[in-house]
């Protein structure tokens, strides 16, 4: 046997070994519509780093932030097909496919942010994740990100509910959100996040609704200087993985992904609270007026949206009662108070 043949035979086991490693590797593309530096994006990137390290290189992770892979709806379709492996998705998009999640989409269903966090950390939060996983959505729901408390921001001040009458307000394309704004007296306009800035600039809309970090990061304050603290929605948002990708993972890899997603859930809320406080400070410095409602003024928004809760919450009365009965975790309530200071 000549030297070259011996060398080839000797190299075969190594070649098979390398080939096996290449086949075992799972490559994860994580798509985000939000920009780099946004609290959920930071927590998701940290999750990815841990995933690469703790899987010993069997799983690779790359973040695509800032909507470079498309709008949220487009990204969801890519995750469903397996072209993108993971994302964080708004429940406004999930709701039409998995109706149960619309319970979390109902206006004023949570008393405050601490109450919402208590819910998603517990039994009800896991039940909703399971509903998403077991639906036709074609994704595995792993954990929750805090999507913040949504308020109105407008070109003209909204100091009481009557000021909203006739205003065109951008919302996500979910009937619950559209009817919420309509019942408040405005005109809910479904629109992708990336279209809001120009729509405000050109007068296509009079305002939108979201949390302070999103309002700041997307520069919407440049065209809408009034931020009214309605707190009408407090929305958690799930981290999801394509079912096709999930089924490629070994059981121990699935366990690792779930563990790290849960860790990201806890890390993100600390990042969120800081970014929310920082955003509010920067927005005020940029000339934004934050309008705080009296209890009576806020109740007017609550009462106006009762038909939405009655209509969309009717099939889930028992679940809503369970949510209302949950007592806020005292530690979360304390953290919430500190963040607000």
In which residue ranges do the predicted regions lie?
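Bacterial N-terminal signal peptides that target proteins for export
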Residues: 1-10
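Bacterial N-terminal signal peptides
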Residues: 9-19
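N-terminal secretory/targeting leader peptides
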Residues: 12, 25-116, 123-124, 130-341
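Bacterial Sec-dependent signal peptides at the C-terminal "C-region" and cleavage site
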Residues: 21-23
């Amino acid at each position: 046997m000549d030297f070259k043949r011996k060398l080839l035979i000797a190299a075969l086991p190594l070649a098979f070994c390398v080939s096996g490693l290449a086949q075992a590797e799972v490559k994860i593309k994580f798509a985000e519509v939000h920009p780099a530096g946004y609290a959920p994006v930071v927590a998701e990137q940290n999750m990815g780093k841990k995933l690469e390290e703790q899987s010993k290189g069997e799983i690779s992770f790359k973040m695509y932030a800032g909507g470079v892979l498309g709008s949220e709806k487009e990204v969801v379709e890519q995750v469903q097909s397996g072209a993108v492996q993971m994302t964080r998705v708004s429940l406004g998009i999930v709701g039409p496919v998995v109706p149960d999640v619309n319970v979390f989409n109902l206006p004023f269903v949570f008393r405050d942010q601490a109450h919402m966090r208590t819910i998603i950390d517990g039994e009800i939060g896991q039940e909703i994740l399971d509903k998403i996983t077991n639906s036709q959505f074609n994704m595995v729901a792993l954990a929750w990100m805090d999507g913040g408390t949504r308020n109105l921001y407008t070109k003209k001040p909204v100091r009481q509910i009557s000021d909203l009458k006739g205003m065109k307000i951008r919302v996500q394309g979910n009937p619950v959100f559209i009817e919420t704004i309509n019942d408040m007296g405005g005109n809910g306009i479904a629109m992708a996040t990336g279209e809001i800035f120009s729509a405000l600039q050109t007068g296509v809309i009079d305002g939108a609704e979201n949390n302070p970090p999103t309002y700041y990061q997307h520069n919407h304050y440049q065209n809408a200087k009034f931020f009214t603290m309605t707190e009408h929605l407090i929305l958690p948002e799930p981290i999801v993985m394509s079912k096709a990708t999930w089924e490629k993972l070994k059981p121990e890899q699935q366990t690792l992904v779930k563990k790290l997603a849960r860790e990201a859930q806890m890390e993100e809320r600390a990042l969120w609270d800081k970014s929310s406080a920082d955003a509010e400070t920067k927005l005020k410095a940029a000339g934004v007026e934050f309008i705080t409602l009296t209890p009576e003024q806020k109740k007017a928004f609550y009462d106006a949206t009762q038909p939405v809760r009655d209509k969309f919450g009717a099939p889930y009365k028992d679940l809503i009662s369970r949510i209302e009965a949950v007592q806020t975790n005292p530690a979360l309530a304390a953290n919430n108070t500190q963040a607000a200071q």
